[in-house]
């Protein structure tokens, strides 16, 4: 199972993460696909299920591109649960509020009796 809080879902497609990719991985954008979750899913390397919590008041929302992850998962290989949380930003309080949900979600996939 795989879950995330406010992930940068397609770093090769957003300005700030793409600049970091260029510095660390070089200018060849094709080589970046191995480090881009949306590209990996598009290339058939998905998880059966992914849980993502994203605050709708996140200052970085336009860079995180959750809609790209949602579109990539529609292809059928990955079942995405994308929960847009009203009023939450990109801070500790957001993560601490939903952490138990994520732990229970993973536990339910690992253990039959939870």
Located regions from the model:
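Structural recognition of the beta-strand scaffold that forms the well-ordered cores
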Residues: 1-4, 49-53, 81-84
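Active-site nucleophile loop of the alpha/beta-hydrolase fold
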Residues: 3-13
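Catalytic metal-binding/acid-base residues of hydrolase active sites
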Residues: 8, 57-58, 89
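The feature captures the conserved acid-bearing segment of alpha/beta-hydrolase catalytic domains
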Residues: 12-15, 22-75
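Short, hinge-like loop/turn segments at secondary-structure boundaries
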Residues: 18-22, 99-101
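C-terminal catalytic histidine-bearing segment of alpha/beta-hydrolase fold enzymes
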Residues: 62-114
């Amino acid at each position: 199972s795989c879950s995330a809080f406010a992930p940068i879902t397609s770093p090769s497609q957003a300005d700030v993460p793409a600049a970091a990719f260029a510095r660390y991985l070089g200018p060849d954008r094709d080589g970046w696909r191995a480090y881009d979750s949306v590209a990996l899913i598009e290339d058939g390397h998905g998880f059966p299920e992914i849980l993502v919590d994203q605050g709708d008041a996140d200052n970085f929302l336009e860079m995180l591109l959750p809609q790209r992850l949602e579109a990539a998962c529609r292809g059928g290989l990955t079942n995405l649960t994308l929960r847009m949380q009203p009023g939450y930003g990109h801070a500790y309080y957001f993560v601490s509020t939903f952490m138990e949900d994520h732990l229970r979600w993973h536990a339910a996939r690992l253990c039959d009796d939870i």
